[in-house]
Design a protein with these regions (language model features):
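Short amphipathic alpha-helical "recognition" segments used for binding
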Residues: 12, 48, 158-160
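A broad, low-amplitude sensor of folded, mature protein cores
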Residues: 14-17, 26-27, 76, 110-112, ...
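Conserved mixed alpha/beta catalytic, RNA-binding, or beta-rich assembly cores of soluble enzyme
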Residues: 3-10, 44-45, 51
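Flexible beta-alpha connector loops of hexameric P-loop NTPases
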Residues: 1-5, 37-40
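Conserved catalytic cores of soluble enzyme domains
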Residues: 31-148
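A short, charged, Gly/Pro-tolerant segment at domain boundaries
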Residues: 150-160
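A structural preference for short, pocket-lining loop segments at secondary-structure junctions
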Residues: 8-33
Length: 160
C-alpha cells in the first residue's frame, strides 16, 4: 500500500534520478493508499505525481505488477513515459469490492487485466517478467541515446 514511507521513497528516487540525470524505473504493486494513514496517505498521490513531473526529459518507465490499484494507478505510475504491464496483472483504480459495491454486480474478471487496459490505451506494452530486463533496457537505451553501453552492462544483459 502507498503511504508516507512509499511516497517518500518515490519522491527521493525521482530526485536522485534528476541529480544523476538517470532514468527513473518504478515497478509498483499496490492495493492502493494506506487508509489508516488518512489524508497523509492520499497526499502521496500528489507528491509522487509532482516528483515524477519534475523529471522533465529524464526517462520515466513504469512496470505495473499485479496488482496495481487505486492511488498508485492514478498518480506517478500513470504519467510515466512508457508504461508496461505484466501479463494478467490487475490494473484499475478501484478494487473488486469497491467496483462490486458501486455497480451492485460483480465486475468481470477479464476487465482491467493488463491486456484489457492496454487495449483501452493505458498501457504501452504487456511484457512477461522474464523479458522485462531486456525490454526495459532497450526502452531506456532508446530514450537516452547519450548513455553509452558499457561492457559490464552488455555482459549483464547477455546473461539474462
Amino acid at each position: 500500500s502507498m503511504g508516507t514511507a512509499v511516497g517518500e521513497a518515490i519522491v527521493a528516487s525521482a530526485e536522485l534520478a534528476i541529480l544523476q540525470e538517470a532514468p527513473l524505473i518504478v515497478i509498483p504493486s499496490s492495493g492502493g493508499a494506506r487508509m489508516q494513514e488518512g489524508i497523509l496517505s492520499l497526499m502521496q498521490m500528489a507528491r509522487t505525481t509532482a516528483a515524477a513531473a519534475r523529471l522533465g526529459d529524464i526517462p520515466h518507465v513504469c512496470v505495473m505488477a499485479d496488482p496495481t490499484l487505486a492511488g498508485v494507478t492514478a498518480s506517478f505510475a500513470a504519467i510515466a513515459d512508457v508504461i508496461i504491464g505484466e501479463p494478467g496483472a490487475t490494473i484499475r483504480f478501484a478494487g473488486s469490492r469497491v467496483v462490486q459495491g458501486a455497480l451492485r454486480r460483480r465486475a468481470p474478471v477479464e476487465d482491467h487485466t493488463a491486456e484489457w487496459v492496454q487495449k483501452h490505451g493505458m498501457l504501452d506494452l504487456v511484457v512477461p517478467r522474464r523479458e522485462l530486463r531486456e525490454t526495459v533496457s532497450r526502452i531506456v537505451s532508446h530514450l537516452t541515446p547519450s548513455i553509452v553501453a558499457t561492457p559490464v552492462i552488455e555482459a549483464e544483459i547477455a546473461q539474462t
